[in-house]
Swiss-Prot record:
PANTHER family: 30S RIBOSOMAL PROTEIN S13/40S RIBOSOMAL PROTEIN S18, SMALL RIBOSOMAL SUBUNIT PROTEIN US13M
Stretch list, region Disordered: 92-121
Protein keywords: Ribonucleoprotein, Ribosomal protein, RNA-binding, rRNA-binding, tRNA-binding
Protein name: Small ribosomal subunit protein uS13
Bias (Basic residues): 101-121
Record organism: Petrotoga mobilis (strain DSM 10674 / SJ95)
Amino acid sequence: MARILGVEVPDNKALFVGLTYIYGIGRKTALDILNNLEIDPNKRAKELTDDEISRLSHHINENYKVEGELRQEINKNIKRLIDIGSYRGKRHKAGLPVRGQKTHSNARTRKGPRLTKIKKR
């Protein structure tokens, strides 16, 4: 397996799919990166030369926020929303949906498992 930015990219998959294993890179971004570097997107990771791997790593590192850096920025943004006391921050803190979804009957993923009530006889 080729190692790009600390992430194992699978050898048996097309390179544009393999790059999506890196947090912050989707298919479109992967194709853009490969087109900029003039690397065949359907090439397998095991067929990459050391030079191509270093070019990929350098290009991604210079032009994109990925992995830990991206996660830190997202967490920092959420913390900022909580600190300023915005509605979105309060929803994050309470563990409820942030983007206006209804919560009366749904939102189980965000709210967690149901708390069962003890029935009176």
